[in-house]
């Protein structure tokens, strides 16, 4: 099978760096230099960047799915994507639903601790 009119992909050596002379002769069709990994380390950094971007997307996707099925412990309603959520001992609440168990007053913003009597 011949690739007429198409350039072959470059083979990157595994155990040594590409000589500078070879890099200077590699140009794209528009006259700019081709972006190729020069060493294993550079390839590794590129792989890490792609992996991190994939992980960030996957984490956001999973968080969106988790919030879609999460419900408030008090009102049993769902959560909006940009809504503030209070997590107390693994139970999720809307900010306005998280109230004192004795007087049912909302807490001012900040950290809270349970007092055991």
Swiss-Prot record:
The record's annotation in InterPro entries points to: PINCH-1-4-like, Znf_LIM
Q: Name one Pfam family in it.
A: LIM
LIM zinc-binding domain boundaries: 70-117
Keyword Metal-binding listed? The answer is: yes
What Gene3D superfamilies does the database record attribute to this sequence?
Answer: Cysteine Rich Protein
- GO CC terms, sorted: cytoplasm
UniProtKB keywords: Cytoplasm, LIM domain, Metal-binding, Zinc
Query: What protein name applies here?
Result: LIM and senescent cell antigen-like-containing domain protein 3
User: What organism is this sequence from?
Assistant: Homo sapiens
